[in-house]
């Protein structure tokens, strides 16, 4: 059994059904090993076509099975610190504010960021935190 836990980004969340590892991830989600931030939940709500769809998504799996990690002042401070370190290297306009907050949440909570977003790789190169890229099948052309 693994002690590893993940923090899912929206980039991975929307591609879960396209993953050849969907069954593995579903099992991990059911076991409470895949967490989500309030920020990612807001992104999901923003993408919903209407309130009814948003409410349904939040009350059904996979979202309903994911423990929520909320922002703290320490997380916000770390996100700002990482943004400043990225600015020192001229890369501060790459990662979005949600990406910085999600990465800081994962780093300070001991979670691995599950993503399909190169900006998390850039952040991890700086912070040394764990990330995992979701394996998925790209959409057919």
Curated annotation (Swiss-Prot):
Molecular function GO labels: magnesium ion binding; RNA endonuclease activity; RNA nuclease activity
Family annotation (InterPro entries): PIN-like_dom_sf, PIN_dom, Type_II_TA_system_RNase, VapC_family
Pfam families attached to this UniProt entry: PIN
tRNA processing among keywords: no
Keyword Nuclease: yes
Cofactor: how bound: Binds 1 Mg(2+) ion per monomer; in the crystal structure only 1 toxin is bound to Mg(2+).
Family, similarity comment: Belongs to the PINc/VapC protein family.
PANTHER family associated with the record: RIBONUCLEASE VAPC2
Protein name (database record): Ribonuclease VapC2
Organism of derivation: Mycobacterium tuberculosis (strain ATCC 25618 / H37Rv)
Organism lineage: Bacteria, Bacillati, Actinomycetota, Actinomycetes, Mycobacteriales
């Amino acid at each position: 059994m693994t002690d590893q836990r993940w923090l899912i980004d929206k980039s991975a969340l929307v591609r879960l059904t396209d993953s050849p590892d969907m069954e593995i991830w579903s099992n991990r989600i059911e076991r409470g090993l895949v967490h989500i931030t309030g920020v990612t939940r807001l992104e999901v709500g923003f993408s919903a076509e209407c309130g009814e769809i948003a409410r349904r998504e939040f009350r059904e799996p996979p979202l309903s099975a994911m423990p929520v990690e909320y922002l703290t002042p320490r997380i916000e401070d770390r996100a700002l610190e990482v943004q400043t370190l990225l600015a020192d290297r001229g890369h501060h306009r790459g990662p979005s504010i949600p990406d910085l907050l999600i990465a800081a949440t994962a780093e300070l909570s001991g979670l691995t960021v599950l993503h399909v977003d190169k900006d998390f790789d850039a952040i991890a190169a700086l912070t040394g935190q764990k990330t995992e890229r979701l394996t998925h099948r790209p959409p057919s052309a």
